[in-house]
Amino acid sequence: MRELFVPDGREDAVLIVASDRISAYDFVLASTIPDKGRVLTALSLWWFERIADLVPHHVVSTDVPAEVAGRALLCERLDMIPVECVARGYLAGSGLVDYRSTGSVCGIDLPAGLLDGSRLPEPIFTPATKADRGAHDENVDLAHVAR
C-alpha cells in the first residue's frame, strides 16, 4: 500500500510512501510483510529508470526524509486518472464473480467451463474504477476507460 503526502512548500510535488501493509480485494489485512515497502519502491524505481528514455514519468527524486528513505519517492503532482490496471493470467477474485454472471470479464468473453483459479488462454487486461477509500473498485470494459 502507498500513501501520498504533499511536502511543505511543494504544492507541485507529492511524496509517495510505500508501506509494509497488505491489501487484497479492497481490504487492508492485519498482518504486514517486512520490508515490502522497500522492495516495492526499489522495483518501481528500477522500472522508471529503464523507461526514462522511452516515456516521461512522474518520479522527480529519491531525496526524501530519512524516516522514509528507501520506501518513498518524490514525484511530480499530477491529476490521477481513477483507473486501476489489472493484468490477469488466472480467473480469480472479482474476475471470477463477473465470469460466473456473464461469461466474460470486463467485456472480454472467456471460454465456458472455467473454474476458480483456471489459467486463462492468454493474459487479459481488466481495468477497474478506482473507488474512494472504503468503497470497492468496479470492473469496467476498455470502452469505459477510453471515455
Model-derived regions, located:
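Active-site loop/lid in soluble adenylation, ligation, and acyl-transfer enzymes
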Residues: M1-D132
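A mid-sequence, solvent-exposed acidic-amphipathic segment
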Residues: H144-R147
